[in-house]
Amino acid sequence: GRERHIQQGALRYGKQLVSSGRGESSHQEHPFVAIVTPGTDQERGEVYAMHFVYSGNFIGQVERCQFDTVRMVMGINQEEFCWNLKAGEEFQAPEVVMVYSAEGLGEMTRSYHAFYRRHLIRSPYNHKKRPILINNWEATYFDFDTDKLLDIAREAKKDGIEMLVMDDGWFGKRNKDDSSLGDWVVNEE
């Protein structure tokens, strides 16, 4: 992927946006927008950033008007969203986390990391080292059986790896990318 290839441009008049309408966010369309002052780098410059804590359809938009007022908005992409509320029902929208940094992009990143560690990660491993795990996908793709997985687990254990994640192919008749996705019946072959 190209997730570390930052896309930057001048703040033009009118609207500029990043969005996804395919049911997910990803490294292709990430729910993040930042406005920076000219010359901003990792250590210097002002940053105003927004990150949507949601993995579905989204839109992040920046608008500069004729009076040089700038407005940033972010939320669920309304083009692909419909929610009918009945009397007395509630809808809790996903949250947007906003960060301001006067010390560049590095401080913005550290602020996000600290906030998410304190407020979003709900794990017993929030403040301690997480167990090391290995995923069998790159080693086996769809071609694995019990013996092959046990061999991987034994070798991994020698290196201090504590958990094996059995990836795609454990369910249904899933031995290629275009079949059985979502068939959660264990494939014992």
Language-model-detected regions and their locations in the chain:
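Short, low-complexity, polar/charged sequence segments that are solvent-exposed and flexible
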Residues: 68-72, 113-119, 151-155, 184-185
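Aromatic-lined carbohydrate-binding/catalytic grooves of carbohydrate-active enzymes
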Residues: 125-189
